[in-house]
Amino acid sequence: MSTNNTIKTPYEDLLRTILEQGSHKDDRTGTGTTSLFGQQMRFDLTEAFPLITTKKVYWKGVIGELLWFLQGSSNVRWLQKRNIHIWDEWASEEGELGPVYGVQWRSWPTPDGQHVDQIAQALDILKNNPDSRRNIVSAWNVADLNNMALPPCHLLFQLYVADGKLSCQLYQRSADMFLGVPFNIASYSALTHMLAQQAGLKVGEFIWTGGDCHIYDNHREQVLTQLSREPRPYPQLTLRKASSIFDYDFDDFTIEGYDPHPAIRGEVAV
């Protein structure tokens, strides 16, 4: 891993670009947004771990949600037992969300009544056919969308291996830039580390591609506060190897050198 921890600010740069160039749009939640379409950020995982520093990111929630996805679960009870409540607004009284991310990742239904474990399949491709251009995991199951509490925002990622390094590109159709995107950057960067470790690879880049990249009207002041802060160096992630991609736990992830500015609260647009 490189120790060249030059301060880079692709996330903050995109926030500024949206404020400067975005169009004001109405949205499903009735909140209103400033929106820009088709943007990209790149993060070199060989240098550092992209945990945003201009506000504190809820790291426990990042890892908890990722581990929950990897379980293939559709129920928030596992998260709630660990005092993680990021999905509560969308869950039924029984804690159900329908066939959301984890279900699609681990148990995509096929026409013959079988299921595809996309994560296991992706890892197998990394090990046995790393040059494949078909190593894609999708949560956007059109037949299941109406049964989901919330259709997937970060809906598809592709894995790419070159020179023994694993890179991941995410496509996010709807990007809540203030609340959601810092979380998503950290989550998929962590997943890239996990997959690389299990496949015997090093990490490369995490590339984030967004469709409707928006700042909600009720987050505008928070974003301006965030942009007034001086970015600090990204931390480093140390990952203890688990017996499989599905057996990681909170204690396997150690973040070192994370010195963020204080958290900034914002309401979720439901």
Swiss-Prot record:
Residues in the signal sequence: none
SUPFAM superfamilies: Thymidylate synthase/dCMP hydroxymethylase
Keyword Transferase: yes
Pfam families tied to this protein: Thymidylat_synt
Similarity-based family: Belongs to the thymidylate synthase family. Bacterial-type ThyA subfamily.
Function: Catalyzes the reductive methylation of 2'-deoxyuridine-5'-monophosphate (dUMP) to 2'-deoxythymidine-5'-monophosphate (dTMP) while utilizing 5,10-methylenetetrahydrofolate (mTHF) as the methyl donor and reductant in the reaction, yielding dihydrofolate (DHF) as a by-product. This enzymatic reaction provides an intracellular de novo source of dTMP, an essential precursor for DNA biosynthesis.
Name the record gives this protein: Thymidylate synthase
Lineage of the species this protein comes from: Bacteria, Bacillati, Actinomycetota, Actinomycetes, Mycobacteriales
